[in-house]
Amino acid sequence: MATAYHNLSDYDYESVPCGKDLRIGIAVAEWNHNITEPLMKGAIDTLLEHGVSADNIIVQHVPGTFELTYASAYLAEQHEVDAVIAIGCVVRGDTPHFDYICQGVTQGITQLNVDGFVPVIFGVLTTETMLQAEERAGGKHGNKGTEAAVTALKMAGLERI
């Protein structure tokens, strides 16, 4: 397991670019909001900590994880952001629905990254159990939202190199 010995929230603060002049969009799924809200909070707290102004963080809620692709494209095109963080949570159930949603959102976000000029960060938890999701949304494995925000800052900084 990749996280067996790692807290997702551990990172080298000095390696993260300052976000002072950046605008960051966050698309957040309402489904499994008990997980996505802490992920969003982790992302926002990290962005603020690295200098992104609260006025330059644009949050767009959508009903579910599948809708994150559309919301991410909307944020990139309509709000002129430097990066988008897509936050969602899909927990495996008894039907193939999990596979369809995970595959669809992964392909959608990948396509946005290939076709667009704004990095879209995959902050979607795809877990076997709700406990695994909780452990990655502020639990023993840290907060994946924090990791997604760090990635957004680093990717947005690529244009500035």
Curated annotation (Swiss-Prot):
The active site is at residue 97. GO terms for molecular function: 6,7-dimethyl-8-ribityllumazine synthase activity. Pfam families: DMRL_synthase. InterPro entries: LS, LS/RS, LS/RS_sf. (2S)-2-hydroxy-3-oxobutyl phosphate binds at residues 94-95, 136. Pathway: Cofactor biosynthesis; riboflavin biosynthesis; riboflavin from 2-hydroxy-3-oxobutyl phosphate and 5-amino-6-(D-ribitylamino)uracil: step 1/2. Its EC number is 2.5.1.78. 5-amino-6-(D-ribitylamino)uracil binds at residues 31, 65-67, 89-91, 122. The keyword Transferase applies. Belongs to the DMRL synthase family. NCBIfam families: lumazine-synth. Catalyzes the formation of 6,7-dimethyl-8-ribityllumazine by condensation of 5-amino-6-(D-ribitylamino)uracil with 3,4-dihydroxy-2-butanone 4-phosphate. This is the penultimate step in the biosynthesis of riboflavin. HAMAP family: Lumazine_synth. This is 6,7-dimethyl-8-ribityllumazine synthase. The gene is ribH.
